Regions:
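An N-terminally focused, membrane-permeabilizing/fusogenic/translocator signature enriched
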Residues: 1-86, 237-245
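A glycine-rich, hydrophobic loop/mini-helix early in the fold
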Residues: 88-116
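Alpha-helix boundary/N-cap detector
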Residues: 3, 50-54, 113-117, 130, ...
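Generic detector of well-ordered alpha-helical segments enriched in charged/polar residues
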Residues: 6, 10, 57-60, 120-127, ...
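Charged, low-complexity surface segments at secondary-structure and domain boundaries
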Residues: 41-47, 107-111, 128, 212-217
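N-terminal start-of-chain detector that recognizes signal peptides
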Residues: 46-50, 153-158, 169-174
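Amphipathic, membrane-inserting segments
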Residues: 65-70, 78-81, 88-96, 162-245
Length: 245
């Protein structure tokens, strides 16, 4: 009997202790002080999960729609990079947060720059991952006709290279590698023009080929600007949308 009374008293003390750990703020919110140092809000405000998209067109369609009453809200569209755009709601000052509504990430191929590839792999890469233009075709033609036999050497002065290429059906000739070349790989959203940038085209003694980026990343800034301009044009009628790049 004594033990039962003791257990009941201990339980009552424990309940009283827990009650004391619940703190109410001036705004009416309740917090639980689990260890006297870490306040955890009871029943915090819930936010909808971030909507994940892959194209700029889908983002424009969503922002023009009446889903989630999005067309009536003041929102901020941020071009985070050449492959990512984020949409934020107005600041929730009560909770100290800026809710993110949408995340758009471009689906682009992983292009193996600065890596040596044999002729077949290199040709496939050029045709499948680059816009069809003059310099791409020039590099493709050179790579397709390249021939380095055992004992042959690639002449290199550090800037350009001389290599043996097939000239006609059977004859061979020395040709200088095209350098530098201006190419447009698929690196950003398809709705905007793929930015052009310079590359150094190199060959090694095994007839492997590689492209090395040579513009210092300038193309990334151009891509961000193109994305921002696209969104500004498509969403010009909605004055509640702020676009930042």
């Amino acid at each position: 009997m004594t033990e039962n009374i003791k257990d009941a008293l201990s339980y009552a003390v424990e309940l009283a202790g827990k009650e004391n750990k619940i703190i109410r703020s001036e705004t009416g919110k309740e917090y639980f002080d689990s260890n006297e140092y870490d306040l955890q809000e009871l029943n915090p405000r819930k936010y909808a999960p971030i909507l994940e998209l892959q194209t700029l067109k889908s983002l424009v369609d969503y922002l023009k729609s009446d889903n989630d009453f999005i067309s009536d809200r003041k929102i901020v569209v941020v071009v985070d990079s050449y492959q990512k755009v984020s949409v934020y709601d107005q600041v929730d000052f009560e909770n100290g947060k800026r809710p993110q509504l949408v995340s758009v990430k471009a689906t682009v191929p992983v292009i193996p720059f600065s890596n040596w590839r044999d002729q077949e792999e290199f040709n496939i890469m050029l045709q499948s991952m680059f816009i069809n233009d003059a310099d791409r075709n020039l590099v493709l033609d050179f790579a397709s006709h390249l021939k380095i036999e055992k004992g042959a050497e690639v002449q290199d002065n550090g800037i350009s290279q001389m290599a043996t290429v097939r000239d006609g059906v059977a004859s061979l000739a020395q040709a200088k590698t095209p350098n530098p070349v201006t190419l447009r790989p698929y690196r950003t959203f398809n709705e905007v023009e793929q930015p052009a940038s310079q590359f150094v085209f190199r060959i090694n003694k095994s007839a492997n080929l590689a492209l090395f980026e040579a513009d210092g990343g300038k193309w990334k800034l151009e891509a961000v600007e193109s994305i921002a301009n696209y969104l500004k044009n498509e969403l010009a009628s909605n004055k509640k949308i702020t676009i930042l790049a």
